[in-house]
């Protein structure tokens, strides 16, 4: 991410957004050290417009139909709780990985606390960002269980319920039957 110029990153990011819009596909973003700039570009490219949100089948969460659904996924989200809430209000979905299990990672815990479960996914980002108790070793897909367990603990609900909801969220986001 620091191996090319910012304007090159931004050009190709905008081009990928335009391509997703042309093909009416979801957008998956890994924003690193560019939180506000990412948000600005998404707004400039009208990713959260009512027209774009109308392209996708309505998703239903525990509280009913999602108020807004832009089919934007912030993969491996590590931004602030406030930024996460802004994204969700605009219709984005956030995905959290192993760092939510780290003892000193209060920022991601606060984000999970603040975001309705219907707007969250769990992931591994394998082979990186390995959750506790395997931190420091290569990550594996099977370790997503530890991320889901931590989300369940934060939300105060069962592992099974959290696993089911986040799995359904993923299926609905990617339109998997």
Describe these PLM feature segments.
Residues 118-140, 162:
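Short acidic/histidine-rich active-site segments
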Residues 19, 142-177:
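Mid-to-C-terminal alpha-helical segments outside catalytic/metal-binding sites
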Residues 38, 101, 124, 147, ...:
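Ser/Thr-centric signal marking residues that sit
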Residues 5-121:
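Catalytic pocket-lining loop regions of alpha/beta-barrel enzymes
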Residues 41, 131-132, 173:
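Residues that scaffold the ATP/ADP-binding catalytic core of kinase and kinase-like folds
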Residues 1-12, 135-143:
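Alpha-helix N-cap and loop-to-helix initiation/capping positions
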Residues 44, 89, 109, 137-139, ...:
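Hydrophobic alpha-helical segments
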């Amino acid at each position: 991410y620091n191996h090319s110029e910012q304007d090159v990153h931004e050009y190709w990011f905008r081009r990928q957004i335009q391509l997703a819009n042309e093909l009416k596909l979801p957008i998956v973003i890994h924003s690193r050290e560019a939180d506000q700039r990412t948000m600005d570009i998404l707004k400039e490219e009208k990713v959260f417009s009512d027209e774009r949100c109308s392209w996708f089948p309505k998703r239903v969460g525990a509280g009913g139909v999602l108020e807004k659904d832009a089919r934007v996924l912030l993969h491996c989200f590590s931004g602030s709780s406030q930024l996460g809430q802004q994204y969700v209000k605009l219709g984005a979905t956030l995905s959290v990985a192993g760092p939510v299990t780290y003892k000193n990672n209060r920022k991601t815990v606060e984000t999970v606390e603040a975001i309705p479960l219907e707007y969250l996914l769990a992931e591994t980002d394998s082979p990186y960002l390995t959750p506790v108790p395997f931190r420091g070793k290569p990550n594996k897909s099977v370790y997503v269980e530890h991320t889901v367990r931590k989300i369940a603990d934060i939300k105060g609900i069962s592992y099974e319920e959290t696993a089911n909801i986040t799995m359904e969220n993923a299926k609905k986001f990617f339109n998997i039957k």
